[in-house]
Amino acid sequence: MRQKVVFPGTFDPLTSGHFDLINRASILFDEVILAVAASPGKRPLFSLEERLALAKEVCQSLPNVTITGFSNLLIDFMKEQQATILLRGIRTGSDFEYESQLAAMYRRMMPEMEIIFLPPAEQYAFVSSTLVREIALHGGDAGQFVTPNVAEAIKAKQLQLAQS
């Protein structure tokens, strides 16, 4: 049986830390589904379509990674994908605490689910989409925390926001 893992997130924007986890997951699993959440309640900087396009570009060198958007309950999405393994990145103790609570809830709703927590490589342990957005929204250069295509998209978004 092929091992399939779902790595969900808003990915607004996709960071170098995310890519590190995706790349490592692509080595560990036969198939990785990067599930980009619509998350309208979070008021994302990039639209779902933009986030999907950026993720596809970032992951183009990984043939066993599929990028897809979703707006339903993660449990339902996983069932649609016939996946029972969930990958979550954890950077800090507070991430672990929050993710452990989510894991307990997910397991209650889908008992056959396995949840894997994967810490980032050390150089990405402090990188988060929230911090990258904050840098970008204040006119800073977040390029060292994202891939070149995402850095260009952030610069374009900065110009767009400055003109509005």
Swiss-Prot record:
Q: Where does ATP bind?
A: T10, F11, H18, G89, I90, R91, E99, Y124, A125, F126, V127, S128, S129, T130
An example GO BP is: coenzyme A biosynthetic process
Q: Which GO terms describe its cellular component?
A: cytoplasm
Places the protein is found: Cytoplasm
Which residues, by range, are in coiled-coil regions?
none
| Source domain of life | Bacteria
Query: Keyword set for this entry?
Result: ATP-binding, Coenzyme A biosynthesis, Cytoplasm, Magnesium, Nucleotide-binding, Nucleotidyltransferase, Transferase
The protein's annotated catalytic reaction(s) are: (R)-4'-phosphopantetheine + ATP + H(+) = 3'-dephospho-CoA + diphosphate
**What is the first-listed, main subcellular location in coarse terms?**
cytoplasm
The molecular function terms of the Gene Ontology recorded here are:
ATP binding; pantetheine-phosphate adenylyltransferase activity
According to the record's subunit comment, the protein's assembly and interactions are: Homohexamer.
Free-text function comment from the UniProt entry:
Reversibly transfers an adenylyl group from ATP to 4'-phosphopantetheine, yielding dephospho-CoA (dPCoA) and pyrophosphate.
Q: What is the designated name of this protein?
A: Phosphopantetheine adenylyltransferase
Taxon lineage = Bacteria, Pseudomonadati, Pseudomonadota, Gammaproteobacteria, Aeromonadales
